[in-house]
Amino acid sequence: MIEIRFEEREKIGLQYILESLHGCSPFGQERIRRLRYYTPDQRQELELELYNVERAAAHAEELKDLYDQICVVLCQMKDIRGSLRRCRELEVPDHVELFELKGYLQRLETLRPMFERLRDAAGLTGLEFHDPAPALAILDPENTRSRGFYIPDAATPKLREIRAAKKQVEEQLYRAQTDAEKDNLRQKRVRICAEEDSEEMKVRRAMGAALAPLADDLMADADTAGRLDFLIQKALFAHRYGGVRPEITDTALELTDMINPELCDL
C-alpha cells in the first residue's frame, strides 16, 4: 500500500488541495481524509476515475444547480454503516438506529434520480445506486413517507391490542378522582408499557432481520455516495483552476503550463 506522509503532502501542495475540498457527506469526507493512492495494477480503475472527473468538470457550469441539489442531499446523510453491520449480524436495532436508517433511505431515494440525471448528462460510468424501495418498505410499511420513525399499531395484532389497552388506561387515569384509583391505574399502565416495549422489540428484531439481506447493497450505496461526493468536489476544483485530465504513460513525467493553486489563492 502506498503511503505519503503529512509533511510530504504539505511540501508538494497536496494537503492544501485536500483542505480545499469540502466533502458534504460523512462518506465523502472520509474519502478525502483517507486518501487512497493507486498502484500500477489499478491503472484501469484510476483511468475510470479520471474520466468521470473530466466529464463532471466539463459540465460544472451547465449542471451547477444540479450539483448544488445533490450536495444538499449528501449533507443530510448520516453515517449509518454501524447500524447496517448490526442488522447484518442479526442484532436488534434500537429506535434511533431505525430512525436514522429510514432517514438515510429517504435521502437515497431523493438522491438517486438526481444522480441519474447527472450520469446521463455528463456521461459518467461505473457508479450505480440500488433501489432503496424494498428497504424503505420495511421501515415505513404504511408508506407514510414521514421523516420520523414509528412502529405502527398494525405491526402485530398483539401490539394493536396492547396500545388500545394503554390508551384506555390513560383515559381512565385522566378521569380518576381519588389518589388510590390513580395509583392503581399508574401501576397498570407501567405493566402495559412493559408489554408494549417487549412487543416493539420483537418488531424491531424482525425489521433488522428483514434488512439483513439488503445490508451489503446499502453499504455499497454509502460507498457510492462517498465516491460521488468526492468526484463532484474534485470536478469543481478542476473547473475552478482549469484542470485537465492527465494522460498516464509509461515514459517520464512531463508537465505543461502547470499552476500552483496555493500560490494562485494568495
Locations of regions flagged by a protein language model:
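Long amphipathic alpha-helical segments
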Residues: 114-129, 202-209, 237-243
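Residue-identity detector for glutamine
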Residues: 15, 29, 42-44, 76, ...
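A structural signal for well-ordered alpha-helices, especially hydrophobic packing surfaces
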Residues: 50, 54-57, 61, 81-84, ...
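Hydrophobic transmembrane alpha-helix bundles
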Residues: 105-112, 130-138, 159-163, 238-253, ...
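Conserved amphipathic alpha-helical "coupling/scaffold" segments
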Residues: 1-151, 155
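Extended, charged alpha-helical coiled-coil/arm scaffolds that mediate oligomerization and mechanical coupling
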Residues: 131-223, 227
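Conserved NTPase motor "head" modules and their coupling/switch loops across ABC/AAA+ ATPases, GTPases
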Residues: 220-266
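Short, solvent-exposed coil/turn linker segments
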Residues: 91-92, 217-218, 260
